[in-house]
Amino acid sequence: MHVLLVGNYEPDRQESMRRFVDCLLRELPRHGVNVELVRPTVWFGRRRIGGGLDKWLAYLDKYVLFPPVLRRRIQRAPSGSIVHVGDHSNSVYLRDDLEPRQIVTCHDLLAVRGALGEPTDCPASPAGKLLQRAILRGLQRAGLVVCDSTATENDFRRLTGGRRRSQVVRLGLNGPFRRLGLKETRAGLASLGSVLLDRPFLVLVGSSLRRKNREFALHLLARLKPRWPGLLVFAGEGLSKSQQALRDALDVGDRVIVVQRPSHEVLEALYNQAHALLYPSRFEGFGWPIIEAQACGCPVVCSNTTSLPEVAGNGALIRDVDDEEGFVADILSLHDRARREALVRSGYENVKRFQPERMIADYVAAYRSLATP
């Protein structure tokens, strides 16, 4: 079986999409699948003009230069090859004449929903609205749409009228996250100084996008400040200007640490040392940090929105996304050793559902279903 795997444009720096594609490239050959990666070449995108024009140069690479390249690669591929678009935002590359042999992974439809006027904290410009509509049309040219979660599949069926074939294949862990010993944890945190070894902290992993709800986390920290001596670590992107302003207005600057683009070793150590993963997102398609934390024995406190309850299972304390006092109560409750240990055990049990081997086996079965006349 031959699969032509369509990857992302590298300058877009879509880390979660890169990790997903890397997992497929690494694991599929072990299941007898020959995988060939193809993605847009950076040509016009090498130039830096500024003034908002860089995005349009990238569009030339992605939407003008790449489609004929992909078409030629498909023509040269072995007969019966499957075309797998690894990120739904690239569904614009799907073709009507190849529908039965095209599969696309839909990680979420938040941007599409935002472009259609739904409240997802994903506003779209006029050009963005056109692109998101093109993405939705592209999804409907696939022979099979694989969604990361039931929540995302429900969105897909609703937006397309349930006319296209779809199924759920939940993501697997994207790295070897595990419980570390004290020595390994200290080594992983060494580059961040001693403060994270001396004081308890919550870790919030992800970008600074509005839907990640960092502002809510800062308000939680302000509520916790007189009752708990801990810190809040933002791992991922730096704080936006508005988030910095809110941090200062709430007078919690001395309690906030930002770790930008942590390595796997640093992130794993953060999970191992943290009082809990705080994950109050308003909208998600999956929620990888939840299972990463659970695999490391880190308690999880998260919101009850979109895919998060489905992913967290019984291994998290789950609250309404606007329930500040409830989140505070759950965070403080983890001082109870028995409650904490029970939650950690439930997390270990839950993460068994998300082994990469299971995800890969499901994708191989999906490929075979398309390859069979």
PLM segments and residue spans:
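Carbohydrate transferase catalytic cores enriched for Leloir-type hexosyltransferases
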Residues: 1-373
